[in-house]
Design a protein with these regions (language model features):
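Generic structural detector for well-ordered beta-strands
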Residues: 5-7, 36, 70-72
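Amphipathic, hydrophobic secondary-structure cores in small proteins
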Residues: 19-55
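C-terminal structural segments of small proteins and small subunits
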Residues: 47-76
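Intrinsically disordered, low-complexity segments enriched in polar/charged residues with Gly/Pro
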Residues: 4, 11-12, 45-48, 57-58
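Intrinsic-disorder/low-complexity, polar/charged segments enriched in Ser/Thr/Lys/Arg/Asp/Glu/Gln
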Residues: 1-3, 30-34, 66-68
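An N-terminal amphipathic alpha-helical segment
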Residues: 1-27
Length: 76
């Protein structure tokens, strides 16, 4: 398992989800991706995308005006 980060700050919906999808497609099953966003909708949108696409959300949190979502890549 490897860990990766994606900076999706200052991007508005739907770009954080699209960038997450693009990055996940480059990774292997079991890898973890931490996504940093400033779009509050990403707190719901990225986990919903993960459920639909077979990935696991490890953690979601809001710190100040930032949303952080940690995703474990499933089999793609």
């Amino acid at each position: 398992m490897s860990e990766f980060e994606l900076d999706a700050r200052r991007m508005l919906c739907p770009m954080p989800v699209i960038k997450t999808q693009d990055k996940v497609n480059e990774l292997s099953e079991g890898d973890q991706l931490t996504v940093f966003c400033t779009d509050p909708g990403a707190l719901n949108d990225i986990p919903a995308w993960c459920r639909i696409n077979g990935h696991k959300v490890i953690e979601t949190k809001e710190i100040n005006d930032e949303v952080i979502v940690v995703v474990e890549v499933g089999s793609v």
